[in-house]
């Protein structure tokens, strides 16, 4: 069963030519056949089938069905589902079961979505390759010697490999968009606060945002409509009006659009194939009536430095709760309480997580707080002002999702700084909190996926997805 979009699936379900149970069985069979790829950490065989049967009965009895009736979805394993494992791909939470549902889970279930399982990821969402998981690597579906991107690599691979029609991920600095670019799918990070973070395990709370990975911009818009909105359990969620993103997307046309193209993004450091595909897509839009506007974001190179100071500082605070005393892994080698804390964290956390905790603790320490953390917050505000100013004159800011195509497994694990640069084009949108999307452009000369990255103004996801949809069709 190969479905191109949820719209296609919904038509067949409502017409009776397909049943939810039939669809779910097909997906579960493919998931089981691909088990060696480590895409899923937990698969909900019985739960998914029981829900599918319930939805089939609901339709047969003439009940009103939800906006996402029968949509088979995968969930990144840092989003809470009551009664299911919540591992964050870490040894320290390997056997932890959530006692509540995330707000997004409740909202999706209320509209009749079906969850197939929890996907692999970089541990605690820290990574750009899905190589930091305690459950093993995830290969790229288009070349199994290469990475799928991260940290939502399992979710991206699930959609690309046709193991789910849509997946949820989380995006802190590019963790939805970069793997989407590496896996030839759409990856949306909404405006910060557009979707409730209640039930999302925190990495960096002022950056984290739940996002959507899908085959089409239309599917991403439908899922966003359901998840968006104020939540009393998340003080950072916004009460801004939830639009009909799918309808808004359909109304966008290239005539009169102004697309900002930062010259700083197109340097000799950018892979030649990536540059060629991005520029060809922009030229196509110009030929269809859009205006390409040269803009300058002169200090973009400093975004990565500010980002890693801020997110590691927040991570060192957020991850202090995993101490072996309250829940999760506890060491068996401890002579006293202090040793239990130290050994539980040493044994339970992976190398990259420990590296970031140490960096964060350092930048928050006495004597360095003003030099690093405070200065990085000032840089963050500077970038917010810069992007606000740019988007007063253009509709979106366009560039590559990644400076290079998917790289080989193990190629960058020995050089953390090189790995961090994989997010150089996605980090600025996270720093400023604006919505951004990666849209697939096709394949390079090595038959590897390439993505285009678009940043829009606050709460303009409908327009952003409409422009992305035109590029996907280019």
From Swiss-Prot:
The keyword ATP-binding applies. The keyword ATP-binding applies. It comes from Chlorobium chlorochromatii (strain CaD3). Belongs to the amidase family. GatA subfamily. Its EC number is 6.3.5.7. The active site is at residues 76, 151, 175. NCBIfam families: gatA. The lineage of its organism: Bacteria, Pseudomonadati, Chlorobiota, Chlorobiia, Chlorobiales. This is Glutamyl-tRNA(Gln) amidotransferase subunit A. It comes from the Bacteria.
